[in-house]
Amino acid sequence: MSEQIEGRNAVLEAFRSGKCVDKLFVLDRCQDGPVRTIIREARKKDTIINFVQKERLDQLSETGAHQGVIAQVAAYEYSTVEDILEKAREKGEAPFIFLLDDIEDPHNLGAIIRTANLAGAHGVIIPKRHAVGLTSTVAKTSAGALNYTPVAKVSNLGQTIEELKKEGMWFVCADMGGELMYNLNLTGPMGVVIGNEGEGVSRLVK
């Protein structure tokens, strides 16, 4: 699957054919009929829409013929949180999930997915906004782990954590000021929260 789709007809067809579009970039103040239709389709799918200047679109464009719209498409299909929990149930294991708070670098996301797979995690949860999605770079860096590790995308990571707590899960955050992991009893239904490269775990998630 292509990582990026450009041009009005191609982008509209991507939405209508059911492709998983992570982000849509639209020329700011462009309000003609085809663009309005694309925006309407994007909102139906709850896609992140970024209204940007022409210079930004030109910078992102791989073809030089974006016509004011660029869609970034997930290289892999997303799972749901329930899919991840079901995977744990099928194995007869307590859920073990990695939750990533605004990871921006695709190489980092791919490496974390690889680590999650090696650690025996049942899946990874990422937020829809302010974070990289499942690009081809992520897939390549994961070294095949993306084929075995489901990734779910949620609107509100903090809310998802609260819902999982009700399911009996508990959570630890990777934090420079925290305790040594060797001093903790890391057993049972558990989630590991990893924060942004620069800011760490956000206050709302902590």
What are these regions (language model features)?
Residues M1-K87:
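N-terminal positively charged helical leader segments and presequences
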Residues E3-E6, S79-T80, E104-H107, A152, ...:
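Short secondary-structure boundary/capping elements
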Residues A10, P34, R56, N156-T160, ...:
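Short acidic active-site motifs
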Residues V11-L12, D32, E77-S79, P106, ...:
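Glycine-rich nucleotide phosphate-binding loop and flanking beta-alpha elements
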Residues E13, E41, T115, E163, ...:
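Hydrophobic/aromatic ligand-binding patch that stacks against planar heteroaromatic rings
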Residues R16-K19, E86-E179, N183:
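RNA substrate-binding interface of SAM-dependent RNA methyltransferases
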Residues L60-A75, S142-A145, P150, T187-G195:
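Short basic, glycine-rich beta-strand/loop surfaces that mediate nucleic-acid
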Residues V172-K206:
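Active-site/ligand-binding-proximal alpha/beta "capping" segment
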